[in-house]
From Swiss-Prot:
Taxonomic source organism: Mus musculus
Biased composition (Polar residues): 50-59
Induction notes from the record: Expression is repressed by FOXO1 in pancreatic beta-cells.
Composition bias, Pro residues: 240-253
Tissue expression profile of the protein: Duodenum and pancreas (Langerhans islet beta cells and small subsets of endocrine non-beta-cells, at low levels in acinar cells).
Region of interest (Transactivation domain), residue spans: 13-73
Species lineage: Eukaryota, Metazoa, Chordata, Craniata, Vertebrata
Domain remark from Swiss-Prot or TrEMBL: The Antp-type hexapeptide mediates heterodimerization with PBX on a regulatory element of the somatostatin promoter. The homeodomain, which contains the nuclear localization signal, not only mediates DNA-binding, but also acts as a protein-protein interaction domain for TCF3(E47), NEUROD1 and HMG-I(Y).
PANTHER family: PANCREAS_DUODENUM HOMEOBOX PROTEIN 1, PROTEIN ZERKNUELLT 1-RELATED
Family indicated by similarity: Belongs to the Antp homeobox family. IPF1/XlHbox-8 subfamily.
GO CC annotation: cytosol; nuclear speck; nucleoplasm; nucleus
Protein name, as recorded: Pancreas/duodenum homeobox protein 1
Subcellular location: Nucleus; Cytoplasm, Cytosol
Residues covered by region (Disordered): 30-116, 202-284
């Protein structure tokens, strides 16, 4: 088979869409597309009807080119010379690039001088997890400058000033808070939190006082009994006017009061009761 027949056989192969089991392929040109040489995965097996035609093409194809690729052309064809000139460079791109470790060094041989600094503050470790920084497999270390929020210890002088301020104002204003912070050598946040906690404590104490002041029975206190017994057959206790100091005792006062047996404020009236029994009404 001469070069002309081989060229027409290759052209017929690219024109037939069933050879690659794809859609219609455009006309074959002298410069084949570069994607034919960039594929890394092996192509699917050829259909049985083209096995005989491809067998003749495999004899003249180089070992590095797949049977589906363009067969070699004659040396006098300029397209074939151009194809063989660019073939080694295109096949060299299919190899993977060298690894990131130069000079054949292993990944375990490299040691990180400093561990990766975490960009976000919430990703840093706290003092509660500081033991993880000593673990050999830990991905982070506990930073010494990282301070965990601790409980503020107020002095007696500071507590005295704060209690005095709370006695007058349950809610402190911003200017007064700044003034107290400068005077007591505290921050505004410390004073704000102290007043919040103190208000909660004060509310709990007030609720406890209200609950303890109300009796369990739910009723109010009993009223004192009045010393007044009004019966139909008894005499009423009358309170006569007090005698003038150093004066004579009025004639209506009984002898028991004169002798001091009864208190001078209370006495039995000698006159009979003015309350008369009710008479039943006669039917009309």
């Amino acid at each position: 088979m001469n070069s002309e027949e081989q060229y027409y056989a290759a052209t017929q192969l690219y024109k037939d869409p069933c050879a690659f089991q794809r859609g219609p392929v455009p006309e074959f040109s002298a410069n084949p597309p570069a994607c034919l040489y960039m594929g890394r995965q092996p192509p699917p097996p050829p259909p049985p009807q083209f096995t005989s035609s491809l067998g003749s093409l495999e004899q003249g194809s180089p070992p590095d080119i797949s049977p589906y690729e363009v067969p070699p052309l004659a040396s006098d064809d300029p397209a074939g010379a151009h194809l063989h000139h660019h073939l080694p460079a295109q096949l060299g791109l299919a190899h993977p690039p060298p690894g990131p470790f130069p000079n054949g060094t292993e990944p375990g041989g490299l040691e990180e001088p400093n561990r990766v600094q975490l960009p976000f503050p919430w990703m840093k470790s706290t003092k509660a997890h500081a033991w993880k920084g000593q673990w050999a497999g830990g991905a982070y270390t506990a930073e010494p400058e990282e301070n965990k929020r601790t409980r503020t210890a107020y002095t007696r002088a500071q507590l005295l000033e704060l209690e005095k301020e709370f006695l007058f104002n349950k809610y402190i204003s911003r200017p007064r808070r700044v003034e107290l912070a400068v005077m007591l050598n505290l921050t505004e946040r410390h004073i704000k939190i102290w007043f919040q906690n103190r208000r909660m404590k004060w509310k709990k104490e007030e609720d406890k006082k209200r609950s303890s002041g109300t009796p369990s029975g739910g009723g109010g206190g009993e009223e004192p009994e009045q010393d007044c017994a009004v019966t139909s057959g008894e005499e009423l206790l009358a309170v006569p006017p007090l005698p003038p100091p150093g004066g004579a005792v009025p004639p209506g006062v009984p002898a028991a009061v004169r002798e001091g047996l009864l208190p001078s404020g209370l006495s039995v009236s000698p006159q009979p009761s003015s309350i008369a029994p009710l008479r039943p009404q006669e039917p009309r």
